[in-house]
């Protein structure tokens, strides 16, 4: 039993990974878990410089670094990926996780287009930039790799609000499916994780800041009872997709949502 535990903890042994949006929430949980599972190096890429450096230092500077990076700026992403590959001798896993969510209702009739552009810039353009540049580096290195995007449960259905966010996440699924087909010849796998909302800095804009908020507003729509959603659960899914355990998995969206897709989800009408 002990041997199995040790093996599981080393599922990412020797791998070099990048986690965008890694300074908080799901990204932070993933960076910590990747190191726990034996990753040789994890680079946190985020615009939150002070917080990102603090997280990297708490994980350990010998295994974790921080690079300030705006994921929608292609030159910054390209530079960050080049620095990672040069510093650590490769790139095995890219987790495109950075995202934003407006506090406005953003219904179709009242869609604020400047806010819409902000969401699409980070969630859709940012994901495309990260996938593109990671793919280029992985093809150049010639040893395959795993690219993971954070799509979300909003990526496969509509909603009564946050139209811009829903649209941005639908686009991520299209990106994952297309990239998986195009990059398979290079032994590069492309998948996504789709969490239900957990209490992270992102969800605060929608009034979900604590586990109690999750319990009140979201759990009624989840079929699995007694298991509150956490960032660590999503991190485990990302670790699986980044590891050799998922060696024959590509083009897949892995829901981490407690069965929310099995039930009506009418946000705002409860």
From Swiss-Prot:
Entry-linked SUPFAM superfamilies: NAD(P)-binding Rossmann-fold domains
Catalytic activity field: (S)-8-oxocitronellyl enol = cis-cis-nepetalactol
Molecular function in Gene Ontology: isomerase activity
Sequence intervals crossing the membrane: none
Pfam families: adh_short_C2 (PF13561)
InterPro entries according to UniProt: NAD(P)-bd_dom_sf, SDR_fam
Keyword Cell inner membrane: no
Function: Functions as a non-oxidoreductive cyclase to promote the formation of cis-cis-nepetalactol. Cis-cis-nepetalactol is then oxidized by NEPS1 into cis-cis-nepetalactone, which belongs to a family of metabolites that are both insect-repellent and have euphoric effect in cats. Binds NAD(+) as classical short-chain dehydrogenase/reductase (SDR), but does not utilize it for its redox-neutral cyclase activity.
Entry protein name: (+)-cis,cis-nepetalactol synthase NEPS3
Species name: Nepeta racemosa
Gene that this polypeptide is encoded by: NEPS3
């Amino acid at each position: 039993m002990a041997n199995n535990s040790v093996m599981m903890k080393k599922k990412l042994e020797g791998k070099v990974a990048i986690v965008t949006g890694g300074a908080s929430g799901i990204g932070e949980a993933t960076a910590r878990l990747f190191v726990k599972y034996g990753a040789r190096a994890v680079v946190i890429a985020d615009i939150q410089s002070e917080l990102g450096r603090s997280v990297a230092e708490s994980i350990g500077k010998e295994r974790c670094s921080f690079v300030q990076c705006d994921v929608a700026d292609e030159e910054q992403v390209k530079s960050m990926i080049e620095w990672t590959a040069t510093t650590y001798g490769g790139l095995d896993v890219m987790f495109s996780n950075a995202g934003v969510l407006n506090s406005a209702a953003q219904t179709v009739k009242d869609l604020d287009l400047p806010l819409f552009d902000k969401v699409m810039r980070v969630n859709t353009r940012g994901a495309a930039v990260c996938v593109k540049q990671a793919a280029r580096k992985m093809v150049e290195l010639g040893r395959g790799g795993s690219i993971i995007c954070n799509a979300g449960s909003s990526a496969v259905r509509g909603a009564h609000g946050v139209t811009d966010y829903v649209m941005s996440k639908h686009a991520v699924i299209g990106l994952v499916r297309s990239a998986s087909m195009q990059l398979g010849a290079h032994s590069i796998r492309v998948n996504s994780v789709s969490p239900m909302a957990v209490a992270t800095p992102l969800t605060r804009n929608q009034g979900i800041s604590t586990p109690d908020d999750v319990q009140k507003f979201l759990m009624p729509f989840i079929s699995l009872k007694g298991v509150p959603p956490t960032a660590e659960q999503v991190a485990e899914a990302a670790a699986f997709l980044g590891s050799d355990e998922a060696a024959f998995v590509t083009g897949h969206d892995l829901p981490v949502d407690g069965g929310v897709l099995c039930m009506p989800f009418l946000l705002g009408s409860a």
